[in-house]
Amino acid sequence: MIKSAQETCSILVVENSDDFRAGLAHELHQLGHTVTVASERREAMGLEDRAQFDLLVSDLVNQASATEPEIVRSFKMAATGSQSRRAIAELHVIIEKILSFKLRRIDVAQPTDQIREKIELELPSNLTLMNGVLEYLVDRVARLGLIKVEQSNLFVALDEAFVNAVKHGNRNDTTKLLRITAELSAHEAIFTVEDEGEGFDVCEIPDPRDSANLFKSSGRGVLLIYNIMDEVEYSERGTRLRMVKRPEGLRP
């Protein structure tokens, strides 16, 4: 079903692979959206009215340093604040469609230990957008052999990190963005979650590993993150959280 003009989004796809670019544009057209494509960043920067776009989907592959066996496909999605206020439900559908399309395209037979993938997402602070992102990230980590989905609580840790950033960092303000970065390989998965909130004094966080704090309701999410992840680090201002997950055999 074609969406009405009021619900139609303007999407810019920047991708150097002809097949991937055409396929993704077709998928988004099928949802009823207006899609503009560019084969490289320089071409995209030459567009006259770049402010018209509600969503950007861009590859992040550095052709000078990456070869096909070493990197599958890195990409970035960024949504504007105006789009989040206008049609947050439609943005949810678009993001899940892009992630689903990418998942179908990149699963090719390659030695797992040579695959490296980087994902960057910029999303409005709305929790309804997060489930598809969570499922996608956990699936990618599982396919690289870092975890077994049925035995892992990685989904829980990432969910707690996203919820904390949206609710406590950005205070559910959809005009503020949540930035999520995932750097994935067969050896480790590094996740960074950054909000646009005012921050907080990291030193004031009760140590969730201290037995005196185990039964306190506050900080329960932080406790889960510390228990599930192998490394957890907050930035000095408290607006960025870095988490590392490794397979059992590679843990320090």
Q: How should each PLM-predicted stretch be described?
A:
Residues M1-N16, F20, A25, R42, ...:
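Non-catalytic signal-transmission and effector/linker regions of two-component phosphorelay proteins
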Residues L12, V37-L55:
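Acidic, metal-coordinating helix/loop segments flanking the phosphotransfer/catalytic sites
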Residues H26-L31, L47:
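Alpha-helical interaction/dimerization surfaces of two-component signaling modules
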Residues L55-V61:
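Active-site residues of response regulator receiver
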Residues A87-R105:
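Receiver (REC) domain switch/output surface
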Residues D107-I119, V166-P252:
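Conserved beta-strand-loop-beta-strand hairpin that lines the nucleotide-binding pocket
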Residues E135-D159, L214-F215:
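Conserved short strand/loop->alpha-helix "switch" segment adjacent to the catalytic nucleotide/phosphoryl-transfer site
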Residues D159, V163, K167:
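Short alpha-helix lining the ATP-binding pocket of the histidine-kinase-like ATPase
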